[in-house]
Amino acid sequence: MARPLSFHEDRLFPSDPATRSYARGLYALVKDLPIISPHGHTDPSWFATNAPFQDATDLLLAPDHYLFRMLYSQGVSLDALKVRSKAGVPDTDPREAWRVFASHFYLFRGTPSWVWLNHVFSQVFGFTEFLEASNADDYFDRITAALATDAFRPRALFDRFNIETLATTEGPHESLQHHAAIRESGWGGHVITAYRPDAVIDFEDERSPRAFERFAETSGQDVYSWKSYLEAHRLRRQAFIDAGATSSDHGHPTAATADLSDVEAEALFNSLVKGDVTPEKAELFRAQMLTEMAKMSLDDGLVMQIHPGSHRNHNVGLLNSHGRDKGADIPMRTEYVDALKPLLTRLGNDPRLSIILFTLDETTYSRELAPLAGHYPVLKLGPSWWFHDSPEGMMRFREQVTETAGFYNTVGFNDDTRAFLSIPARHDVARRVDSAFLARMVAEHRMDLVEAEELIVDLTYNLPKKAYKLDQRPDWARPATLRAAAE
């Protein structure tokens, strides 16, 4: 018989009774605040069409690299989990794939995925027993049946989750038709996009040739000419802003920036376009384009996010058989102080610019990132990211960053996920961890309770809204409830 599934109301709170009491009170202030999700990777077509999700495997398992990478590490084939390969979606029975997942669910004990998924199973679907092999079919049937109902369509879940803003991420070579459909539908949900130009900046990316072709189509520019290439970016950035975007996102291998002259930059671009691509030239161009994007932000106001330091697609065999984003991305050492200096020397004191830095290298928190953000007015620190968005990772971030950068040089939490149903769980974890961190400071008499109460609301709601300029969005983009309240 499966074990009972229950979520303790004090989960993730300190074990010391006095400190735990403070954490409870702080969490109570933010538990029901709206979710601000300013950076993520959900599919905008979900909200444009509002079509029902297919089944448990299609929604929860096959797209989630957090899940299938763990099972793959234990010898489970991706085909058995119905994960898409370059040949297409395998013909594996989705029920059988779910059974495989259920029989291996114990592998996630101690991981954030264990917390998130059990939150989804308990709070979203109402399960009262842990998932295991014996109840795999019951889980599959109940989840799949629920997904067929109107209450579990994407827009209904968006409203149920109390999401105020949700940002997706698209490239300049991609259509924004789904965002247009959302806006024209009359639905009040605030779903916006973000500008991610990596595929038309990184000449080492195998997607680059096709992305350039589509970039030319979407922008109407000759993107193989340097000046027209930059103009294409400006035009597409404005199109993204018209679709609600307030930020751009840059996932380069390193944090390198450069400040070449116009002549040098054009010569480098021309060389790359002609096919003379070397690792050194590709890296220099990526570095220069971060500075070019920053210069454009001075004019159009997009907040820059820099997500460096991932060795993408480390497993070459899996890349060849299944393509990108199959759980084989590995964190790398990342240097920021010298890497960012060219950009910061050029633009680091300009009040029109805002850059949010992320890292997969936790050794840089106190040595590089906190001192940089604690000095340069253009810099803020993004929350613990990807491999570190666990309760422990969130606590390490606060402990190592706060002493130098404080709280107000950070931007609150963002979930950065494709897993739509896990968004409330991820934000709940962040709210609990921040409550626990502040509770400890109150218990140690490092701040009083009133200060902690102000801070927990800022960390949860006000800071992400301000950092991503969501408090400046046009009236059409505000939820109907907020528009009505303002009238």
Curated annotation (Swiss-Prot):
Pathway: Carbohydrate metabolism; pentose and glucuronate interconversion. Coiled coil: none annotated. InterPro entries: Metal_Hydrolase, Uronate_isomerase. It is an enzyme of class 5 (isomerase). Keywords: Isomerase. Belongs to the metallo-dependent hydrolases superfamily. Uronate isomerase family. It catalyses: D-glucuronate = D-fructuronate; aldehydo-D-galacturonate = keto-D-tagaturonate. PANTHER family: URONATE ISOMERASE (PTHR30068:SF4). The keyword Membrane does not apply. Gene3D superfamilies: Metal-dependent hydrolases, uronate isomerase, domain 2, chain A. Its EC number is 5.3.1.12. This is Uronate isomerase.
